[in-house]
Swiss-Prot record:
Ranges of compositional bias, category Low complexity: 68-82
Family annotation (PROSITE patterns): BHLH
InterPro entries membership: bHLH95_bHLH, bHLH_dom, HLH_DNA-bd_sf, IND-like
Record CDD domains: bHLH_AtbHLH_like
GO process terms (BP): regulation of transcription by RNA polymerase II
Molecular-function annotations in GO: DNA-binding transcription factor activity, RNA polymerase II-specific; protein dimerization activity; RNA polymerase II cis-regulatory region sequence-specific DNA binding
Modified residues (Phosphoserine): S35, S138
Protein name per the record: Transcription factor bHLH129
Length: 297
């Protein structure tokens, strides 16, 4: 791929033939570009060196088949066979390419290369075209990307429009890509929603139910007893399952039964008295009964 030093020395002595050999050694004697066009053989003309010198706006030297802008430097010394990367100067696209102050559209052209012989001018190198324009040419209609109407969206938002629409399309009708797709979406502007929609949302959330099932549910909830007190739900008394709780409950049950019998036997015993007073009254009642039995001989 790198041309030898002998070919460069021959280029200074032999003229056009040596330049042709140098170009063939760098790019290859024959190339088959059947995907780009009809299969032809490459016959480079001797005017390649002059074309580079006459075109001052050329950015780098493009070799056939090279995807990047890295080319062979013809002004380099004969002792060096390295490749030099050349980038465009500052402000190159602003000066040499047309710009559109009102639009943001740009077009990307596919690389084109034609190789022919006979009366045709020399081979056109593979290159990518980057153009910023807003014209209505046939090339832009097929290879240009549609602009996003940001200015129109901002103007519509200022005029009180609630939402703006943006669409992206790819309607290329060439042999490279026959598929077409269209994607569209809508963006709601913040703070521009109507008050009617908010009021309808609040009314739906806090208004009375409308369906029959909801009405029946509300009636069941409204039928609350007047004497009921809202309290925390708790377990009923006497339903503890722990063994100690069960034993204590049984003991209290036996004591309550005995006191009831004692209340039946002892007169003038108030039910609100304590257990100690009830036992004292029971003992006094028993002593009185014993004294009556002893008096009756």
């Amino acid at each position: 791929m790198y041309p030898p030093n002998s070919s460069k020395s021959t280029a200074h002595d032999g003229g056009g033939d040596a330049d042709t050999n140098q170009y063939d050694s760098a790019a290859g004697a024959t190339r088959d570009f059947s995907s780009l066009g009809p299969q032809t053989h490459h016959h480079p003309p001797p005017q390649r060196q002059q074309q580079h010198q006459q075109n001052p706006n050329l950015v780098g030297h493009y070799l056939p088949g090279e995807p990047s802008s890295i080319g062979f430097d013809s002004n380099a010394s004969s002792s060096s066979s390295l490749f030099r990367h050349r980038s465009s100067p500052a402000g190159f696209y602003d000066q040499h390419l047309p710009t559109d102050p009102n639009g943001t559209g740009f077009s990307l052209g596919r690389p084109n290369g034609g190789y022919g012989g006979g009366g045709e001018q020399g081979p056109s190198r593979l290159k990518s075209e980057l153009r910023f324009s807003s014209g209505s040419s046939s090339h832009q209609e097929h290879n240009s990307l549609p602009r996003i109407s940001e200015v129109e969206a901002a103007a519509a938002a200022r005029n009180g429009v609630a939402s703006s629409s943006m669409s992206f399309g790819n309607n290329r009708t060439n042999n490279w890509d026959n598929s077409s797709s269209h994607i569209s979406f809508t963006i709601d502007q913040p703070g521009k929603r109507s008050k009617n929609s908010d009021f309808f949302t609040l009314e739906t959330q806090y208004s009375m139910p409308q369906t029959t099932l909801e009405m029946a549910t509300m009636e069941n909830l409204m039928n609350i007893p007047e004497d009921s007190v809202p309290c925390r739900a708790r377990a009923k008394r006497g339903f503890a399952t722990h063994p100690r709780s069960i034993a204590e409950r049984e003991r209290r049950t036996r004591i309550s039964g005995k006191l009831k019998k004692l209340q039946e036997l002892v007169p003038n015993m108030d039910k609100q008295t304590s257990y100690a007073d009830m036992l004292d009254l029971a003992v006094e009642h028993i002593k009185g009964l014993q004294h009556q039995v002893e008096v009756r001989p």
